[in-house]
């Protein structure tokens, strides 16, 4: 089964979730987002990832095997630009480079990479053996995020610091709310990390790690994953952006949402 889901988004058509899950549809603008499943196969987040969730609620929601999840990134094509949103873990199992190749893209072809935050499963694909993987890419990272990781002890931030150093000549630090190349808007989604950022293009909202367990957190945004660095801010961002997406009829794409990797 092909692991890349292609959706061409239409600004003039309103379609049901079921239709979106099974069809591609075209627009005048031809904005396309593709799901890249970096770690193949089923993935589940266990109860220990959400320690504040009562046992009774966990069982009521039927999470016997855990909450369905994934490890993913996205390829966005819009306004003549091809943009990679996060780069996965960069481990031996990583499907990023093979999936880009299926789309006819070599690492040196990529010109734009937008990073939601500096955790290893989002920036690992930027380096191989400590060297640049995407030599011609301009890398965009929230300024608060970059500065926060620079200030952390090395035992927590060595990988992030390495990425920032190796890509320093191609690094662009933006402020939340800035419009990035391709008409992509950056949106503050702070809490999971200090400068965690979502990205919006038309009715696409890429939410990064806003949700680690969509089947739980879409209904109960007040529950955080243990990975969320600022628990209060993370819950507030999750609640705000879910509301924002619903009010504006946006489709959310997340790096840990299960297949088909998007949700209304």
What are these regions (language model features)?
Residues 185-198:
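Active-site glycine- and acidic-residue-rich loops that bind
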Residues 4, 18-95, 109, 135-188, 203-209, 233-249:
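Metallo-beta-lactamase
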Residues 93-140:
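Active-site metal-binding motif and surrounding structural segment of the metallo-beta-lactamase
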Residues 84-87, 111-121, 140-142, 188-191, ...:
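Active-site neighborhood of phospho(di)ester-bond hydrolases with catalytic His/Asp-centered motifs
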């Amino acid at each position: 089964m092909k692991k890349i889901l292609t959706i061409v988004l239409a600004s003039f058509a309103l379609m049901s979730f079921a239709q979106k899950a099974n069809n591609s549809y075209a627009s005048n603008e031809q904005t396309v987002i593709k799901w890249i499943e970096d770690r193949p196969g089923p993935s589940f987040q266990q109860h220990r990832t959400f320690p504040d969730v009562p046992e009774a609620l966990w069982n009521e929601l039927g999470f016997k095997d855990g909450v369905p999840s994934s490890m993913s990134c996205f390829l966005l094509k819009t306004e003549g630009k091809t943009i990679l949103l996060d780069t996965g873990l960069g481990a031996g199992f990583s499907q990023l480079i093979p999936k880009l190749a299926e789309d006819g893209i070599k690492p040196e072809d990529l010109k734009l990479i937008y990073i939601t935050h500096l955790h290893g499963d989002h920036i690992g694909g930027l380096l191989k053996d400590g060297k640049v993987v995407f030599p011609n890419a301009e890398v965009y990272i929230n300024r608060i995020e970059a500065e926060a990781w620079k200030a952390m002890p090395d035992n927590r931030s060595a990988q992030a610091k390495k990425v920032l150093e190796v890509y320093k000549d191609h690094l662009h630090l933006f402020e939340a709310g800035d419009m990035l190349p391709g008409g992509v808007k950056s949106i503050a989604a702070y809490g999971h990390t200090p400068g965690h950022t979502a990205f919006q293009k038309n009715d696409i909202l890429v939410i990064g790690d806003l949700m680690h367990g969509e089947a739980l957190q879409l209904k109960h945004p007040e529950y955080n994953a243990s990975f969320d660095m600022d628990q209060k801010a993370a819950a507030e961002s999750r609640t705000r952006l879910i509301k924002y997406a619903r009010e504006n009829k946006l489709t959310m794409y997340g790096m840990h949402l299960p297949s088909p990797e998007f949700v209304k």
